[in-house]
């Protein structure tokens, strides 16, 4: 019996690979982090087989590199993600997201009365780790929400 271990998503020469994204989360990351606002080629793998996770999503962005802040903001959505820097088809850097103190310009406050909905301000949430949850506190209305509530928003 032979095992066919071919790449299911084409390799990139230079850029960023976000691997080990939980299945069904890849599109949300593309949208929230505005990863599609580029002229560079983006390759997306959805529901790919994974030994560790069963199924996973994968995003490859050519000629684009994420900042440390961007990598860490992934922690809410994909805490087990691996972010690889690729140069000349080789992995030259590898990092994992760690929960940041703040998340800016990504999330929308679930409080419909929050001033952030009516004014041209950038969203900003303080991140607080709780026993079984992560709480996000809006900078403007100062209300605190479970991260699940904010992510579903």
Curated annotation (Swiss-Prot):
Cofactor: Zn(2+)
Alphabetized GO MF terms: metal ion binding
SUPFAM superfamilies recorded: Aspartate carbamoyltransferase, Regulatory-chain, C-terminal domain, Aspartate carbamoyltransferase, Regulatory-chain, N-terminal domain
Cofactor binding notes: Binds 1 zinc ion per subunit.
Keyword terms of this UniProt record: Metal-binding, Pyrimidine biosynthesis, Zinc
Residues annotated to bind Zn(2+): 109, 114, 138, 141
Gene3D superfamilies on file: Aspartate carbamoyltransferase regulatory subunit, C-terminal domain, Aspartate carbamoyltransferase regulatory subunit, N-terminal domain
A GO cellular component annotation in the UniProt record: aspartate carbamoyltransferase complex
GO biological process, one term: pyrimidine nucleotide biosynthetic process
Any matching Pfam family: PyrI_C
Record-linked InterPro entries: Asp_carbamoyltransf_reg_N, Asp_carbamoylTrfase_reg, Asp_carbamoyltrfase_reg_C, Asp_carbatrfase_reg_C_sf, Asp_carbatrfase_reg_N_sf
UniProt subunit comment: Heterododecamer (2C3:3R2) of six catalytic PyrB chains organized as two trimers (C3), and six regulatory PyrI chains organized as three dimers (R2).
Purpose: Involved in allosteric regulation of aspartate carbamoyltransferase.
HAMAP family on file: Asp_carb_tr_reg
Family note: Belongs to the PyrI family.
Protein name: Aspartate carbamoyltransferase regulatory chain
Species lineage: Bacteria, Pseudomonadati, Pseudomonadota, Gammaproteobacteria, Enterobacterales
Gene: pyrI
């Amino acid at each position: 019996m032979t095992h066919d271990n071919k790449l299911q998503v084409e390799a990139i020469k230079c850029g960023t690979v976000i691997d080990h994204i939980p299945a069904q989360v890849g599109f949300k990351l593309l949208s929230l982090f505005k990863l599609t606002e580029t002229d560079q080629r983006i390759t997306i793998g959805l529901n790919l087989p994974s030994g560790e996770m069963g199924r996973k999503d994968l995003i490859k962005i050519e000629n684009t590199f994420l900042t440390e802040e961007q990598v860490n903001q992934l922690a809410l959505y994909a805490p087990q993600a691996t972010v690889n820097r690729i140069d000349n088809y080789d992995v030259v850097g590898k990092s994992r997201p760690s929960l940041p103190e703040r998340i800016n310009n990504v999330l929308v406050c679930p409080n419909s009365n929050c001033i952030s909905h009516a004014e041209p301000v950038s969203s900003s949430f303080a991140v607080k780790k709780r026993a079984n949850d992560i709480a996000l506190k809006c900078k403007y209305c100062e209300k605190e929400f479970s991260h699940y509530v904010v992510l579903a928003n």
